[in-house]
């Protein structure tokens, strides 16, 4: 399988896409979340002067099993997988 290149200014995903991603918390716990892309930052939000990949703000409808929606910001493109319908 060929590795996808994450190119600043050329995002792989669009607003409205259903995606999955993992987050690692400060306690070391890693959780997987499904959500919908709300905002695309084509040049990323991490490396302002030298962007390496786009980032996304993703709406998770059931944050950590609480039933509460949460907008998770600045998720790097390399951490996201599209959910096929």
Predicted regions, residues:
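Intrinsic-disorder/low-complexity loop/linker signature
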Residues: 10, 27-29, 43, 67-68
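Short beta-strand-centered aromatic/proline hotspots
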Residues: 29-46
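Hydrophobic beta-strand residues in large extracellular and virion-surface proteins
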Residues: 16-21, 35-39, 58-61, 75, ...
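Acidic surface patches and DE-rich sequence motifs
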Residues: 6-7, 25, 41, 47-48, ...
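Short linear proline/tyrosine/threonine-rich motifs used for host-factor recruitment
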Residues: 21-23, 30-34, 71
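Intrinsically disordered, low-complexity, charged/polar segments
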Residues: 53-85
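Short, solvent-exposed secondary-structure boundary/capping segments
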Residues: 44-56
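Mixed-charge, Lys/Arg-rich low-complexity intrinsically disordered regions
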Residues: 1-18, 22-25
């Amino acid at each position: 399988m060929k590795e996808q290149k994450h190119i600043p200014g050329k995002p792989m995903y669009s607003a409205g896409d259903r995606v999955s991603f993992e987050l690692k918390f400060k306690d070391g716990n890693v959780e997987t979340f499904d959500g919908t892309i709300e905002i695309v930052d084509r040049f990323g939000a991490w490396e302002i002067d030298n962007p390496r990949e786009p980032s996304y703000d993703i709406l998770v409808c059931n944050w950590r099993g609480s039933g509460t929606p949460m907008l998770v910001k600045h998720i790097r493109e390399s951490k996201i997988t599209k959910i096929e319908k």
